[in-house]
């Protein structure tokens, strides 16, 4: 086992990364190795898909499958060996189909593309060891390995967003072509550091287009988000909790529970769903329960209803003994947990009806969400005017992925200390760090603006570009500071997107990605001013000194 893809990866005297019997996320060494085997199989498929495009062959099934299956290898997504084995078998089938289609064509493919490892289910962990991500670290050096992993984890993040967009009807053959080309590049086992660095930024550029697609899919399907108060307290009655990121699944659950006397709650990054007009038509979408993903074992154990995980992040449900009332969807999996194929949630509804639900209604406590792209752009003229007259001095984007490290208290501490002439934008499950802080308003404008899910960084980027145009300056000249919390691979690709757009002086934390060596961190600092978080006091002194 060698896994170093998330923020909570182990740091020991013998090295960085989860390398023993079990990762810190809970996946076993066998599952980790099986996921590495799946990654290798997908790199092989993409290598053939990239070659096929060069001779005019496009396989739509391949274009959909590879990102979806790669999504299954993200942190806290799929721990089910049978499901992973199925993805590997399918990858082999598609690779073989493309091989036949390309037979006789004079194409140069990397050795990985045509390799035949023992991918029978019982041997996949062994195959994973053959293709372990650090298998040639001694030969290529830690810097090149780190850059390869930066590209791979960026591709994992973009794969997740491509799948989210596909579910909402958004596909693009040019995006698929770019994705396969990047995968094929990695399959060639590159060793040129400059080339790898450029590739990482190109992945970030491609992701900007994918975030645009996802934004179009969400707003085209559900309408433009509107500022909406969300109840954060239970209401008496039967209950279903929907976690993850998939708005499509949430809508189907609401449609199928209408008139059944079941209240539906969002959890984690599903909270921004309340801002979309399409969900306002369902009054039994009653509120948001709980907070960020890392608290789910206690929160799910206390929830008296059925639970649906539509995407990451899933933690071992056995700890809270709720494995018999949690269901997985799409690419999510856990051994022994019931998986919902298709869009029929009858089993979930029956489970909720058999459970007690909440006995009493608590006094409401609300949180405002819904400051998506359109809402921000609509407010932009008023924001610009407040900046010009000195009522708003600085903007802070404080958000991203949350996690369990104590150092993450920095984000809430910084938000509390910021003066009243500053505005805070937040997104992702990092928003829950700011719970309980009374931000008030600046001349009628709320000081805290929840932009949405992690992928809604697109809306924040669009606002920054609009402000830069209005003030006739570059984005880096704006009174704007990005303070990002990262945890997994979606955050990595968003960071790459920001860097590809030329955004500088980003602060990230709570720790540096384990796959980035000191040399790579120094390079990112020199070229982009990228730095780790320090203390709230230092951040304020550095950003408000002018």
UniProtKB/Swiss-Prot annotation:
Binding residues for hybrid [4Fe-2O-2S] cluster: 245, 269, 313, 401, 429, 454, 488, 490
Thermal dependence of function as given in the entry: Optimum temperature is 40 degrees Celsius.
Needed co-factor(s): [4Fe-4S] cluster; hybrid [4Fe-2O-2S] cluster
GO MF annotation terms: 4 iron, 4 sulfur cluster binding; hydroxylamine reductase activity; metal ion binding; peroxidase activity
Phenotype upon loss of function: Cells lacking this gene are unable to grow with hydroxylamine as the sole nitrogen source.
EC number: 1.7.99.1
GO BP annotations listed: response to hydrogen peroxide
Cysteine persulfide sites (modified residues): 401
Catalytic activity annotation: A + NH4(+) + H2O = hydroxylamine + AH2 + H(+)
Sorted UniProt keywords: 4Fe-4S, Cytoplasm, Iron, Iron-sulfur, Metal-binding, NAD, Oxidoreductase
pH behavior: Optimum pH i 9.3.
Protein name: Hydroxylamine reductase
Organism per entry: Rhodobacter capsulatus (Rhodopseudomonas capsulata)
């Amino acid at each position: 086992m060698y896994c170093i893809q998330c923020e909570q990866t182990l740091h020991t005297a013998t090295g960085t990364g989860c390398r023993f019997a079990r990762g810190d996320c809970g996946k076993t060494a066998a599952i980790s190795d099986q996921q590495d085997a799946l990654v290798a199989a997908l790199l092989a498929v993409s290598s053939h898909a990239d070659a096929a495009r060069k001779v005019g062959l496009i396989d739509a099934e391949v274009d959909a499958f590879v990102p979806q299956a790669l999504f299954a290898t993200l942190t806290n997504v799929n721990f089910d060996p049978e499901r992973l084995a199925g993805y590997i078998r399918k990858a082999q089938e598609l690779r073989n189909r493309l091989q036949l289609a390309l037979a006789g064509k004079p194409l140069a493919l990397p050795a990985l593309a045509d390799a035949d490892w023992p991918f029978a289910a019982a041997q996949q962990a062994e195959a994973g060891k053959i293709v372990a991500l650090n298998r040639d670290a001694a030969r290529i050096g830690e810097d090149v390995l780190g850059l390869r992993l930066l590209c791979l984890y960026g591709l994992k993040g973009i794969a997740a967003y491509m799948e989210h967009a596909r579910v909402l009807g958004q596909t693009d053959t040019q995006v698929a072509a770019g994705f396969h080309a990047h995968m094929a590049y990695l399959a060639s086992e590159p060793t040129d550091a400059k080339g790898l660095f450029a590739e990482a930024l190109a992945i970030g550029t491609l992701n900007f287009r994918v975030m645009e697609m996802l934004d179009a899919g969400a707003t085209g399907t559900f309408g433009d988000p509107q500022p909406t108060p969300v109840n954060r307290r239970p209401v008496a009655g039967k209950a279903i909790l929907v976690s993850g990121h998939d708005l499509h699944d949430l809508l189907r659950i609401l449609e199928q529970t209408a008139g059944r006397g079941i209240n539906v709650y969002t959890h984690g990054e599903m909270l921004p769903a309340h801002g979309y007009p399409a969900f306002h038509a369902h009054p039994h979408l009653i509120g948001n329960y709980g907070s960020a993903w890392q608290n789910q074992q206690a929160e799910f154990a206390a929830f008296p209803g059925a639970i649906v995980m539509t995407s990451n992040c899933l933690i071992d449900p056995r700890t809270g003994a709720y494995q018999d009332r949690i269901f997985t969807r799409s690419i999510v999996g856990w051994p022994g947990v019931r998986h919902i194929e298709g869009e029929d949630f009858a089993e979930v509804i029956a489970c909720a009806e058999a459970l007690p639900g909440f006995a009493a209604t608590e006094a409401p406590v609300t949180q405002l969400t819904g400051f998506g792209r359109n809402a921000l752009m609509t407010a932009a003229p008023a924001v610009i005017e407040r900046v010009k007259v000195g009522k708003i001095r600085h903007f802070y984007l404080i958000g991203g992925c949350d996690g369990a490290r104590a150092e993450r208290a920095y984000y809430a501490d910084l938000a509390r200390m910021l003066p009243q002439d500053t505005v805070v934008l937040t997104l992702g499950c990092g928003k829950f760090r700011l719970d309980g802080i009374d931000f008030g308003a600046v001349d009628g404008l709320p000081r805290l603006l929840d932009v949405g899910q992690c992928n809604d960084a697109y809306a924040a980027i669009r606002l920054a570009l609009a402000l830069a145009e209005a003030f006739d300056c570059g984005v880096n000249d704006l009174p704007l500071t990005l303070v990002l919390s990262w945890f997994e691979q979606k955050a990595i690709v968003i960071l790459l997107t920001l860097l590809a757009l030329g955004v500088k002086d980003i602060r990230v934390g709570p720790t540096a990605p384990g796959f980035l060596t000191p040399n790579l961190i120094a390079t990112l600092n020199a070229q982009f001013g990228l730095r780790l978080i320090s203390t709230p006091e230092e951040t304020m002194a550095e950003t408000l000194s002018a």
